[in-house]
């Protein structure tokens, strides 16, 4: 995806606007019998924008209001069950950024989000939006983060407009050397399928090791264990992911 925007300060008042374009592509699914099925009906482009206004009431305290809107256009007009999945949606929220000390900063907000689908058989997907982030830096070498997010995710379950996903993440970064960083992360989440009895719980534990060969070249190794517990028979999954990547930057 890509983002283009601008930010303007008027003394204590700040205005920020961004335009966003994102592309989501799903890989083919491999079935237990050895065959595979494609997920091309789930691929979509998203076009949208977000605007935020904020005002610095006190040093370290900046309340804000934010509004976002987007449209999602799928590669295929109908999904595998002949539902029209193109949609429009967005959110509105209010909150504040804060800095208690130089060691403890964060942001918290509450709002409302909704998504309407082209298919009249699908109900409007809506829900309470809560998001927060807290960053604690106990030492110059260690940073701890707590992050919670709410999102509306796509699904192909017949008659279900979408999935309301809430994630809660704890992450700790530690620099052993200037060139060696370790990252530990744990995530717990819930997925509620709207207009459906299905409900999932997500657990993920992850470890990363980042080796900074130079300012421009980083090598990253990752091991992750993902577990999904579902109240639907046969819907639970577990996976272990091992990745090795390279990051180039200027």
What is the role of each PLM region?
Residues 8-12, 21-27, 69-75, 112-116, ...:
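Transmembrane beta-strands of outer-membrane beta-barrel pores
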Residues 4-8, 53-55, 98, 136, ...:
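Residue-level signature of outer-membrane beta-barrel architecture
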Residues 209-211, 216-218, 238-250:
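Outer-membrane beta-barrel "beta-signal"
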Residues 10-17, 59-65, 102-108, 140-146, ...:
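Repeated loop/turn-to-beta-strand initiation elements of outer-membrane beta-barrel proteins
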Residues 27-40, 76-83, 116-120, 154-158, ...:
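Extracellular loop and loop/strand-boundary signature of outer-membrane beta-barrel proteins
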Residues 2-83:
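Solenoidal tandem-repeat scaffolds enriched in leucines and small polar residues
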Residues 1-4, 45-51, 67, 90-94, ...:
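Hydrophobic, lipid-facing positions within transmembrane beta-strands of outer-membrane proteins
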